[in-house]
């Protein structure tokens, strides 16, 4: 860990320089008043810091879980919050509220959510000004939120995104004698490089920032052993590997629950309706299941189609066209791929792009026949959490290759690894040729997943994170 006190002049200087740069551009636009506003803001910040420097002595069992992103789309941080609550910690969960979090979060009396706004930079002037003003606004907002809340014993922050949250959080933690933990999911600068390229000045600054300020954390968690080695070798940061593990909600779904889910989905998505398109026929039927009201039995539909599932975040680290090319049999963000889907004329394939409630997602995973993962790590050092969830449901996976994928997917054991759309197409043909037979390779992979059991999130968290929190200060 780096001495945070020695870094305070740099943090203060960074804020002041950013303010002066912004002011310079606005002076040129006859906006000298903004320069004065930024200067006054900087003074107020440091007055606030000095005023709130001392804690109230009641922080021993308080933890702030921080993500500068959508809480509802941050499952690992939600799992952290739930685990902390189970062990008696009072949790303040800070992040954007774009998507509804899981019900376990909303119902937990030990978890308080503080919503912050996703700010934007100025939409006029050069791009560097847009970035600078966005960082300044986010810094001020985050600083205010963290200093306003009760003193915490720990702040557990997700990275990425880490700009500006790493610097601001480390400053606040040092002022309030709070221990700072970074959970490294990936490197933020590598995600930026997908858009701007490795040599872009903004990417190079982001890399320096992440490496420099990342060393101020008291503890570090990361998602793979490959990342652990990289952090220590290249950045001098020692981390504990906390693999993503599925919580108990991810499991094979009984056929009755499958039917209930498919009936709900069929009301909105015709792909789940039975062949006659009637959801409310005498025998309740979907494309996959049927319910006999006479004896109450629910069975899978004979000759049912394969339910192939690919969970996607519609981001640049997932090339969804690979799956489309594999299904189409030839090669050449969400709306873009939906246009591609609409342009295809499949004879035996129906494509559905639903948005599921957090409670329905594990039920659908547990009902599927095969998963496809198109996630390619921007750093080559993180693993796709969606595959972890699929394995929790004993769902075999075809996953696209990248450097550390072997830490999760074992080729020809719990799934298959492919490098391009042609390989994926061959794998789909091989795995689904005798569907729904149970003695196929697909059935073999599922049997292996059932036999392996696997560690669940609670056990993994108690083993790797809890000792950090209970260690003497």
Q: PLM features: residue spans?
A:
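Helix-loop-beta element that forms the nucleotide-linked donor phosphate-binding surface
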Residues: 221-222, 227-281
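Conserved acidic donor-binding segment of nucleotide-sugar-dependent glycosyltransferases
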Residues: 309, 313, 411-412, 416-422, ...
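N-terminal subdomain of nucleotide-sugar transferases
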Residues: 2-112, 402
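A charged, aromatic-enriched C-terminal amphipathic alpha-helix characteristic of glycosyltransferases
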Residues: 419, 436-473
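Membrane-proximal helix-turn-helix segments that form the acceptor-binding/catalytic region
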Residues: 82, 143, 147, 164-167, ...
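Conserved donor-binding/catalytic core segment of Leloir-type glycosyltransferases
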Residues: 270-280, 297-318, 324-327
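Short hydrophobic beta-strand element within catalytic cores of glycosyltransferases
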Residues: 370-373, 389-392, 396-400
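Nucleotide-activated donor-binding/catalytic signature segment of Leloir-type glycosyltransferases, i.e.
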Residues: 329, 334-363
């Amino acid at each position: 860990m780096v001495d945070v006190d020695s870094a305070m002049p740099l943090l203060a200087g960074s804020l002041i320089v950013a303010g002066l740069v912004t002011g310079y551009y606005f002076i040129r636009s006859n906006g000298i008043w903004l320069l004065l506003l930024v200067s006054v803001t900087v003074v107020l910040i440091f007055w606030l810091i000095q005023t709130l420097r001392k804690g109230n002595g009641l922080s021993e069992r308080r933890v702030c879980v921080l993500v500068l992103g959508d809480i509802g789309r941050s499952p690992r941080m939600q799992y952290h919050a739930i685990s902390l609550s189970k062990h008696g910690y009072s949790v303040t969960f800070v992040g954007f509220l774009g998507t509804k979090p899981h019900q376990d979060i909303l119902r937990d009396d030990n978890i308080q959510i503080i919503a912050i706004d996703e700010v934007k930079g100025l939409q006029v002037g050069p791009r560097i000004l847009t970035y600078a003003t966005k960082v300044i606004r986010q810094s001020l907002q985050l600083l205010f939120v963290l200093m306003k809340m009760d003193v915490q014993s720990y702040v557990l922050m997700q990275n990425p995104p880490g700009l500006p949250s790493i610097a601001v959080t480390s400053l606040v933690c040092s002022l309030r004698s709070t221990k700072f933990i970074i959970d490294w999911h990936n490197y933020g600068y590598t995600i930026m490089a997908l858009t701007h390229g490795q040599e872009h000045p903004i990417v190079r600054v982001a890399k320096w920032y992440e490496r420099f300020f990342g060393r101020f954390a008291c503890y570090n968690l990361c998602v793979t052993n490959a990342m652990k080695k990289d952090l220590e070798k290249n950045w001098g940061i020692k981390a504990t590997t906390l693999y993503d593990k599925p919580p108990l909600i991810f499991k094979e779904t009984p056929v009755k629950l499958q039917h209930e889910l498919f009936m709900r989905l069929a009301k909105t998505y015709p792909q789940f309706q039975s062949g006659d398109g009637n959801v409310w026929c005498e025998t309740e039927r979907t494309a996959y299941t049927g319910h006999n009201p006479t004896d109450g039995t629910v069975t899978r539909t004979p000759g049912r189609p394969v339910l192939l599932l690919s969970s996607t975040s519609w981001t640049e680290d997932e090339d969804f066209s690979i799956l489309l090319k594999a299904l189409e049999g030839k090669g050449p963000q969400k709306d873009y791929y939906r246009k591609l889907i609409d342009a295809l004329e499949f004879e035996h394939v129906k494509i559905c792009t639903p948005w599921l409630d957090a409670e329905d997602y594990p039920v659908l995973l547990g009902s599927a026949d095969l998963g496809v993962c198109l996630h390619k790590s921007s750093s080559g050092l993180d693993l796709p959490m969606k595959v972890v969830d699929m394995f929790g449901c004993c769902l075999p996976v075809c996953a696209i290759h990248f450097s550390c994928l072997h830490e999760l997917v074992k080729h020809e054991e719990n799934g298959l690894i492919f490098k391009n759309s042609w390989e994926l197409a061959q794998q789909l043909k091989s795995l689904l040729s005798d569907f729904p037979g149970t003695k196929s390779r697909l059935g073999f992979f599922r049997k292996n997943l059932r036999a392996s059991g696997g560690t669940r999130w609670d056990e993994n968290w108690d083993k790797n994170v809890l000792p950090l929190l209970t260690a003497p200060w």
